[in-house]
């Protein structure tokens, strides 16, 4: 009986630990608290549609640019986020996407398209196949792709 009790206790402990890990890994709700300090909503300029079309073409993915809620932190080169300093930040939670761009980069095709690619792939991380090989949307691969 002691062995059975010990096994049940170990199982309960493992399940509780798994639940805590899952909660820690699950993104929180997208909303004002998930945005960098100073973020304000903005309407994407018409140029973003051209960049979206290019990003769809290079990635072979499709999506709806209009479904993204856009934010910027005006007057900054880097935004302070809970995951470090960023020039762009893609978040998806509860079926809603937000993209926040540092104010100095709202007109930067590389930065904006990089965040668009996250949306088209619906994922964090930077799979080399898409971000480097297909689309050239990293600082190092951008110059090669754009011919600069």
Regions inferred by a protein language model and the residue ranges of each:
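Bacterial N-terminal signal peptides that target proteins for export
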Residues: 2-15
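Processing junctions and N-termini across compartments
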Residues: 19, 51-52, 129
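C-terminal motif of bacterial Sec signal peptides marking the signal peptidase cleavage site
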Residues: 22-24
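Auxiliary, metal-adjacent structural segments of Zn-dependent hydrolase domains
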Residues: 28-106, 148
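Post-HEXXH active-site segment of zinc metalloproteases
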Residues: 105-110, 122-148
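Short active-site segment of divalent metal-dependent hydrolases/proteases
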Residues: 113, 117-121
């Amino acid at each position: 009986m002691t062995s059975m009790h010990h096994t049940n206790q170990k199982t309960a402990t493992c399940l509780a630990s798994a639940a805590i890990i899952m909660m820690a890994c699950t993104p929180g709700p997208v909303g004002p608290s998930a945005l960098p300090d100073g973020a304000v909503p903005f309407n994407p300029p018409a140029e973003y549609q051209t960049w979206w079309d290019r990003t769809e073409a290079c990635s072979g993915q499709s999506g709806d640019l209009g479904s993204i809620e856009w934010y910027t932190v005006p007057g900054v080169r880097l935004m302070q986020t809970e995951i470090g300093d960023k020039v762009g930040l893609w978040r998806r939670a509860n079926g809603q996407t937000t993209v926040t761009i540092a104010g100095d980069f709202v007109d930067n095709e590389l930065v904006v398209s990089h965040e668009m690619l996250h949306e088209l792939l619906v994922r964090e991380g930077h799979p080399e196949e898409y971000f480097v090989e297909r689309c050239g949307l990293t600082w190092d691969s951008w110059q090669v792709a754009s011919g600069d």
